[in-house]
Design a protein with these regions (language model features):
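EAL-family c-di-GMP phosphodiesterase catalytic domain
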Residues: 2-16, 29-136
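Catalytic-core regions built around general acid/base machinery
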Residues: 21-29
Length: 136
């Protein structure tokens, strides 16, 4: 579990048979497999049964809904997408990570829908190695 390989969702349909073979080999080596940008590609939900992934990384577009330009009624309606996807991932036994959190409101929302891990500029922008080491 020291190494994680991320597969972009849009690449899952190119050669499914080959991808399944590679993922199986990586799993046998103890590599964690994640699907990145989940929900932005053209693959079906059935793909989650086809490819044995450990983690689903929900694309940031699904949490961008929390901003001042969207009316409250629309926010409540749009919240159902990440809530449903994260719930499905949990029921399938997958870990979840949501990308792109920039505000406290977004982080709070992701806590309420039980997202395992949250990443984004709210916590830190990309850092040079020296600055990163200072944080440790």
């Amino acid at each position: 579990e020291l190494l994680k390989v991320e597969i972009l969702e849009r690449h899952c349909n190119y050669n499914l048979k080959n991808l399944k073979r590679i993922v199986k080999k990586l799993h046998n080596l103890g590599v964690v497999i994640a699907i990145d940008d989940f929900g932005t590609g053209e693959s079906s939900l059935g793909m989650l049964n086809e490819i044995p992934v450990d983690e689903i990384k929900l694309d940031r577009q699904f949490i961008k809904i929390h901003n001042d330009s969207i009316q409250d009624q629309n926010v409540r309606s749009l919240e159902k997408i990440p809530e449903s996807v994260l719930g499905l991932a949990k029921r399938l036994g997958k870990k979840t990570l949501c990308e792109g959190a920039e505000t406290q409101e977004q982080v709070d929302f992701l806590k309420t829908v039980a997202c395992d891990t949250v990443q984004g500029f709210y916590f830190s922008k990309p850092l040079e190695e020296e600055k990163f080491l200072e944080l440790l």
